[in-house]
């Protein structure tokens, strides 16, 4: 499900049984990220899918990238793998920052 920054933030903050995935590259992640995010590079496909296999599919997953495109694709893969509650930050990290929300780094 695609959510705008405000809705994604509010839903994520109220969801205590969730995980946040940053699917950007390590270099992008090192420049700044959303608090609590785990970096899993979407472009490293073998490790991406391997990492997903270690996540409880019952947990809600909040996924973002730079602009929302990679994270959308990641969400589609996750749904195909059986994840039920997957939320894409449609404006990505750029939209998050533009809205003035807190980041690390």
Whereabouts are the PLM-identified features?
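Rhodanese-like catalytic fold shared by cysteine-dependent sulfurtransferases
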Residues: 1-19, 26-60, 66-105
């Amino acid at each position: 499900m695609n959510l705008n920054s405000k809705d994604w933030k509010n839903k994520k903050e109220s969801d205590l049984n969730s995980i946040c995935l940053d699917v950007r590259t390590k270099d992008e992640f090192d420049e700044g990220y959303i608090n609590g995010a785990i970096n899993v590079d979407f472009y490293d496909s073998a490790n991406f899918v391997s990492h997903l296999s270690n996540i409880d599919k019952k947990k809600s997953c909040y996924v973002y990238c730079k602009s929302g495109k990679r994270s959308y694709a990641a969400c589609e893969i996750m749904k195909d793998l059986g994840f039920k509650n997957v939320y894409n930050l449609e404006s990505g990290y750029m939209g998050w920052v533009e809205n003035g929300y807190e980041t690390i780094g």
